């Protein structure tokens, strides 16, 4: 029942803005993409994402955001995958335009189709090898284009529903794009997104922890086999999860015993 009222509150907060955004911004920018820069399309989308997350009382706690600010160039973002809103959280954090590679099946959803047009999502066909070759080239070109998007990939290939301290296997193919584009690779650890839309969890604030590790330069991984590099990144993210979960427990414990809004110095403020 609480979740039901939460959804009602969210709808009341953001539905008018969403409708206005869709009919007067999204459709216009999709139909005349050539008139709107990637940055403008992205920033409008990002603003709406932030409104939606705020409506759900999401609190994003970020560590290592300075690595994004200091990146200075395009990068490949590799993150573990624990919730359906993982991409939205990264969009909310990143002022720099970022798009994502996702499985083709998601393109059947109306919302995803619209987002694909807006921020140039790359949908991967896992069954067709020839299509995969074309899609890999698209991902490489996306990173190489100085005016284009950064690229986010979830190398586990699916959401990890086990929610333990170990990530699923990081597919070697996810890092090969970095080799081909000669791009810096940014390892990212995400935790807490699975609670936001779940019926099993009800919190006054939903903490989401995101940690950015130091980018890995092409010169530092060019001689490492892709499978080994993917495993190294997986181990680092798994290690981060152990520390993040301790912070998460503390946050939730404090939330249960305090009626006041909890603020952390490390909290990311929109």
Where are these regions (language model features)?
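A transmembrane-helix-recognition feature enriched in membrane-embedded lipid enzymes
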Residues: 1-61, 114-115
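Non-catalytic C-terminal accessory region of glycerolipid acyltransferases
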Residues: 4, 133-270
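Catalytic core of membrane glycerolipid acyltransferases/transacylases, capturing the structured
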Residues: 20-29, 41-42, 55, 70-129
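Short glycine/serine/threonine/alanine-rich loop segments
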Residues: 58, 121, 182-183
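A short beta-turn/loop motif at secondary-structure boundaries
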Residues: 66-70, 202-203
């Amino acid at each position: 029942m609480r979740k039901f009222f939460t959804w009602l509150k969210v709808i009341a907060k953001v539905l008018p803005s969403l409708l206005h955004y869709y009919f007067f911004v999204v459709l216009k920018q999709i139909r005349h993409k050539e008139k709107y820069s990637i940055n403008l399309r992205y920033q409008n989308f990002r603003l709406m994402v932030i409104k939606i997350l705020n409506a759900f009382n999401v609190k994003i706690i970020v560590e290592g955001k300075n690595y994004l600010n200091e990146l200075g160039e395009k990068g490949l973002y590799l993150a573990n995958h624990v919730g359906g809103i993982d991409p939205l959280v990264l969009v909310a954090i990143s002022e720099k335009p970022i798009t994502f590679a996702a499985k083709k099946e998601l393109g059947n959803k109306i919302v995803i189709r619209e987002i694909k047009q807006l921020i140039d999502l790359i949908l991967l066909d896992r069954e067709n090898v020839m299509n995969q070759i074309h899609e890999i080239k698209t991902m490489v070109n996306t990173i190489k284009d100085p005016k284009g998007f950064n690229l986010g990939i979830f190398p586990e290939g699916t959401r990890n529903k086990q929610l333990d301290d170990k990530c699923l296997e990081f597919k070697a193919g996810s890092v090969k794009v970095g080799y081909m584009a000669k791009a810096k690779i940014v390892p990212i650890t995400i935790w807490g997104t699975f609670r936001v839309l779940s019926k099993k969890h009800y919190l006054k604030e939903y903490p989401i922890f995101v940690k950015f590790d130091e980018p890995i330069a092409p010169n530092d991984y060019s001689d490492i086999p892709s499978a080994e590099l993917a495993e190294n990144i997986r181990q680092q993210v798994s290690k981060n999860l152990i520390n993040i979960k301790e912070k998460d427990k503390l946050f939730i414990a404090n939330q249960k015993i305090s009626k006041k809004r909890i603020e952390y110095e490390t909290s990311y403020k929109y």
